[in-house]
Amino acid sequence: MDVSALSETTFSPAEWINANYKKFVEENGRDDSEAASAFIRSYVAKLQLYIFNVNNAVEESSRQVVASMPRIAKESAALQADVHRLQEKMSAMRLEVAAVQSETGECMATLERLNTKSQKLQVAKESLQESDGWGNLLAELEDGFERNDLKGVCDKLIALQKSLHAQEQLPGHAERQTQVEDFKNRLEALASPSVVQCFAEGNTEQAQHFVQIFTSIQRLPQLQQYYRAVQKNFWQQQWKQTLELQGTESQPQQQQFLTLYYDQLLEHCQRQVKWCSNLFGENSPQPFLVIAELLPALQPTRDAHILQLLKTSNERLEMLALFAKVNHSFVLHLNSLLEQSHITLSEELHRLLGEAIFEYFHKFIQQYPRLEETQLSTQVDRLSSNQATPSDGVRHLEESTRKLYEWLKEACERCASITSDLALCKLITLLNGIFKRQLESFGRIQRQIGLSLGSSSYAAQSENWSLLQYTMSQLQCLADFQVQLHQFEQDLHTRMVMLSNRLTKPSNRGPITIFQTCDHAARTQLLNSIADYQQKKSEATDSLGIFPQIYATLKSHFADTHDITLNILLQPIETHLAHIRPPVQDHAASGIEMPSFSFAPQESITQIGQYLLTLPQHLEPLLLSPSSLLKQALEVCNIKYTQAIPCADVLLSLVVEQCCVLYVTQILQIKSLPSSAATQLSVDIEYLSNVLEELGLSINLQLSQILTLLKAAPDQYLTLSSGCEPRLVTAIRQMRNIISTQ
C-alpha cells in the first residue's frame, strides 16, 4: 500500500481508493463485483492494521515522554543553578579587575613622570654640553669669515643651528637665535657675488652647490630671490636695447617692439623652466614669477611707450589692435608652456601673472570708445552731404546705410580684438549717437521730398509719379535699415552673453585671460549693464531693448514718409477740390450769389473721379508685388497692410478715405445752400460714390450721411436725420435753412 498519500494536505479517500483499485484491475485483469469486494475487504483490513500500528506507536511515544519529564525538570533546575553561580563569579572578577586597574594606573603615572624628568635631564645635559661648545663654534665661524671659506662657514653654521636647537631650553635662547641669523646674513652677503655671477652665467653646477648651501641654512627663498633679481636686471637691459633698436627703424617697424621683446622672453622662459626644474625641483614656478615681477617694473613702461607712438600715428585703432593681438599671442604661448611643463601656479601667482600681462592695457581699453567714436563720426560725416535732387538723396541713403553697417561691423570686430568686448557696453552707448546722425539724413531727404511736392515746379503737375517712386524707395531703405538694426542688436546680445559667461567664470582656474584682470567694481558694473540690456530685451516689443529710441525715431520716419506718399497722391484731389470750394462767408454779406448748377456732376468732381480711376494702374507697378522690405515698411506704417490683400489696394483705400475726409471738410465750410445747390451737391457725391464702387470701395460714413441729409425733403428732414451725427445734422440743416421743428 502507498500510505504516503495519506499525509498530503489535499488527500481524498475516494480518489485514493479508486486509483488503487484501477491499479489492482490492471495487475489482475479482473473487473467484476467479486474482485471489487475482495479488493475492498483486503484494503479495509490493511487500513485497520495500519491504524492499529499508528495508535500503538503514538501510545508508546506518549509513555516515553511522560516517563522522561521528571528527569528533564531536574536537569533544568541544575542548569539554572550553574548559571547563577557563573554570574556571581563574573561579578567578583569584575571587581578584582577594577582594583588592579586602579593600582597599575597610579604606577604608570609615576613611571611617566619619571621618564619625562629623565628626558629633561638628558636634554639639559646635552644643552650644557652644547653650551660649552657654543663659544668654540662662534670662534671657528669668525675665523672662517676672515678666510672667506664659504664651505667651512656653511658647515660650522649648520653645526651652530644644531647647537641652537639643543640649547632651546636654556636661558638666552633669543640672543643665540639672533646670533645665528646674523651669521646667516653674513654668509648670504659673502656668497651673493658668486651667486649673482653663477646665475648670470647659467652655471648649473655652481648653482646646485648654492642651492645646497642656502637650503641647509633655510634661506632657499632668498636664493630664489637672487635668481629673479638677476633675470629681471638682464631683461630690463634687453627692454632698453629693444626700444633703442626699434627707435632707429621706420614707424611700422617701431610698432613691432613688443612682439620682438615677448618672443625673446618666451624663448628664454622655456629654457629657464627646464633649468629651474633641475635646480629648484620639479614644477618650480620661478620663471613665471620672474615675468610677473618684470613686466610691471619695466622702464619706460609699456603704456608710456605706446602712448608716445599713438601721438605720432594716424591709425591709432589699428595700432591698438596690433598691441592687443601681441598681448593675446603672448599669453596664449605662456598658457601652452604652462600646460606642457605641467606646472600648476598658485592662485596668487596666477592673478599676478595675468595682471602683469594685461593691466597696463586697461587704460587703452578705457580710451578705446572715444577713439572709436571719433573714427565713426568722421566716417558718418563724410556720408552727410546735401543732394541736389530727391532721387540722388534716396540713392545716397541706400549707399550710406550699407556703408554704415559695414563700419559698425568693423567697429565691433575692433572692439573684440582690442578690448575683448570689455568696452562693448560703452560702444553701444556711443552708437546711439551714430545712429541718430544717420537718421538725420533720412529726415533731410524727407523734408527735401516734401519741399519738392510744394514747389512750383511740381505744383504745376497734377500727377507726379516720380516723387511716389522716391517715397517707396525711401520706405524700402528705412525697412532695410530696421532689418539690419535688428540683426545688429541680435549680434550684440550674443556677444554680451558670451562676455557675461567669461566674466563669471572662476578666474583662478584654467588658462590666464584678460577677464581675470578686471577689478571688482568694473566687473560688477559691466555685468549689471549686461543684465539691464537682457531685462530690456525681455520687456521690449518693437526692438531687442538696446536701441529703443532709434526704433521710435525709425517709426516716426516711417509714418512721415507714408504721410508724404499720401500727400503726393492727394495733391491733385486737393487741387480739384479747391476749385469747387464754396465761399466761406454768407451770400448776403458778400453780395455773391451761387451759380445755377445743372444736375450733372461738376467738372472738378469728374476730374477727381477720373484721377481715382487711373490710380490703380499707377500704383500696381509699384505695389503689386512689393519686395519683402517694402512690404515690411508698409506694415509698420499702417496695420491695414498686414491684411491678405494687395498693398496697392490698401494704399488706394487710404487715399479714398482721406479724399472723403477732405470732401467732408469742404462741404462743412458752406454757410448757405439753396435747394438747387443741395441737389447739385448730392449729385456730385453720388457720382463719387459710383466711381468708388467701380474701384471696390465706398464713401465714408460721414459723406454717406451728408448725402442722405442733402436729399431729404425739408418736411422729412427730422425723420431721415435719425441715426446721423448730430454735428452733421445741425450743419446741413443750417446750410439748407431748414427750420427745426423741435
UniProtKB/Swiss-Prot annotation:
Pfam families attached to this UniProt entry: COG7
Compartments where found: Golgi apparatus membrane
Entry keyword set: Golgi apparatus, Membrane, Protein transport, Transport
Key word Transmembrane helix present: no
Lineage: superkingdom: Eukaryota
GO cellular component, one term: Golgi apparatus
Gene Ontology BP, a term: intra-Golgi vesicle-mediated transport
Keyword Transport: yes
Subunit structure: Component of the conserved oligomeric Golgi complex which is composed of eight different subunits and is required for normal Golgi morphology and localization.
Family of the protein in this entry: Belongs to the COG7 family.
The protein, known as: Conserved oligomeric Golgi complex subunit 7
